[in-house]
Swiss-Prot record:
Required for maturation of 30S ribosomal subunits. Its main location: cytoplasm. This is Ribosome maturation factor RimP. It is found in: Cytoplasm. Belongs to the RimP family. InterPro entries: Ribosome_maturation_RimP, RimP_N, RimP_N_sf.
Length: 189
C-alpha cells in the first residue's frame, strides 16, 4: 500500500490516485459518502494547473453544503500530508446524470428514476428503476399495447449490458411510481 506521506511514491510531484483515496476515504465514509473515483492529473500544458478530482456519492442526495464541507476536509487532509507536492486544484463533485449505472449501489441510488437500459440480448428498454436486490432490479415499463398501463419486470444484473438515468421534465405518473416502490420507501414525485 502506498505511503501517503512518502513523496517517492509519486513521480509527478503529486499524490497518486491511490494515495488520495487512502487519505480521504476514512473521513468521507464517516461523513456518509463513498468515493466513486479519484483522478490526479498533471497540468501538462504550461499555465494549466494540476488537478485532483474526487467523485463522491451517497444513498442520500449530496447537496452543495455537504460538497463544500467535504472539500474543506479534503483540503485539510491533503495539506497535512503534503510533502512538497506541486500546486493543484482540488475538485470534489458528484456523478453526473449521465454516469452509467454499473453497481448495485448505483441502481439503488437511482430508485424511482427513469433509465435507458440495454440488455445483453440487444433489447432496449426505457423504464423506471424499482426495488433493487443483490442480484437484480425491478423495472417498471409501459405496457406495449397502446402504451397504456404499466408492468413490472425483474432484470438480473447479469442481463444488463448498460443503463443510464434519463433527464425527466414531466412529473412521473403516480401509478408508475407506486409500482416502482415509492410507497415502500417514502419516495414520490
Amino acid at each position: 500500500m502506498p505511503d501517503p506521506l512518502d513523496p517517492s511514491d509519486s513521480s509527478t510531484g503529486l499524490p497518486s490516485d491511490d494515495q488520495v483515496l487512502e487519505l480521504l476515504a476514512p473521513e468521507f465514509s464517516r461523513s456518509g459518502v463513498e468515493i466513486e473515483s479519484v483522478v490526479v492529473s498533471d497540468g501538462g500544458v504550461a499555465g494549466r494547473p494540476s488537478r485532483i478530482a474526487v467523485v463522491v456519492d451517497s444513498d442520500t442526495p449530496v447537496d452543495l453544503d455537504a460538497v463544500a464541507g467535504l472539500s474543506r476536509t479534503a483540503s485539510a487532509l491533503l495539506d497535512e500530508a503534503d510533502t512538497g507536492w506541486q500546486a493543484y486544484e482540488l475538485e470534489i463533485t458528484t456523478p453526473g446524470v449521465d454516469r452509467p449505472l454499473t453497481t448495485v449501489a448505483h441502481f439503488r441510488r437511482a430508485h424511482l428514476r427513469l433509465a435507458q437500459i440495454r440488455l445483453t440480448n440487444g433489447e432496449d428498454l426505457l423504464g423506471r428503476i424499482g426495488i433493487t436486490h443483490d442480484d437484480g432490479v425491478q423495472v417498471v415499463l409501459r405496457k406495449p399495447i397502446k402504451g397504456t398501463g404499466w408492468t413490472v419486470r425483474d432484470l438480473a444484473f447479469s442481463d444488463i449490458e448498460s443503463a443510464v438515468v434519463q433527464v425527466e421534465f414531466n412529473t412521473p405518473n403516480p401509478q408508475e411510481l407506486n409500482l416502482a416502490g415509492a410507497a415502500e420507501t417514502g419516495g414520490g414525485a
